[in-house]
């Protein structure tokens, strides 16, 4: 059951990331690309969680989980918020940080093998420098950017910023309860992804009347109706 919940959370985050990517391709708004990358990292972290619970954790699944969930998700959220506020220098900074994070996740040695089905704790497998320190700094600065920009513009975009702040709070709670197991963590991941997605759309002035899944169903129904009429 825990693996199914984690897998479902991964699929949801992946679907929402894909929708944001499609919107970026249509509008070329840079914050949409950064937010899409953040939700994609969130989806990969949830997929690694499902892998670890279903098949047992190993070094590879832990590295993916730590890279995507511990090193990338929050910093990329911050990059998106900075881009939304017009700070274009955030884009190259985001690329530079992503490269650093990937290098750390691939290269740093583990202090102990990763085994079992419970969510591994970083302090049991990674030295403080550089992996854990970079994660702390990246998450702190990324979250700070999101919160400061959301609060400073909340009068202009109350709904969007409120949803983003709620999503950040839910994501932080999910990280805090990781010790309780994969099921509650997966639920928090799914809830945070949905809140963040809605907040991103409201903040960027996108239409949010239909969910991505409902839009797809509507397009399929229209194509089917068109085919029947032609016949």
Predicted region positions:
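Membrane-proximal helix-loop-helix units in multi-pass membrane proteins
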Residues: 75, 85-144
């Amino acid at each position: 059951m825990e693996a199914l919940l984690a897998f479902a959370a991964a699929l949801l985050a992946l679907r929402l990331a894909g929708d944001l990517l499609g919107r970026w391709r249509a509008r070329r708004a840079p914050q949409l690309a950064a937010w899409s990358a953040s939700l994609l990292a969130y989806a990969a972290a949830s997929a690694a969680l499902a892998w670890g619970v279903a098949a047992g954790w190993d070094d590879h699944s832990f590295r993916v989980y730590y890279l995507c969930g511990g090193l990338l998700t929050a910093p990329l959220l911050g990059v998106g918020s900075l881009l939304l506020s017009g700070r274009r220098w955030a884009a190259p900074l985001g690329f530079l940080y992503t490269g650093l994070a990937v290098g750390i996740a691939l290269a740093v040695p583990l202090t102990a093998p990763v085994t079992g089905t419970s969510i591994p704790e970083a302090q049991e497998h990674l030295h403080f420098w550089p992996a854990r320190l970079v994660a702390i700094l990246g998450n702190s600065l990324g979250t700070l950017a999101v919160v400061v920009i959301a609060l400073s513009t909340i009068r202009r975009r109350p709904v969007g910023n409120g949803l983003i702040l709620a999503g950040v709070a839910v994501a932080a709670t999910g990280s805090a309860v990781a010790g309780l197991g994969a099921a509650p963590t997966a639920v928090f991941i799914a809830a945070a992804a949905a809140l963040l997605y809605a907040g991103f759309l409201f903040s960027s002035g996108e239409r949010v009347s239909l969910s991505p899944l409902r839009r797809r169903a509507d397009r399929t129904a229209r194509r089917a109706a068109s085919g029947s009429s032609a016949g």
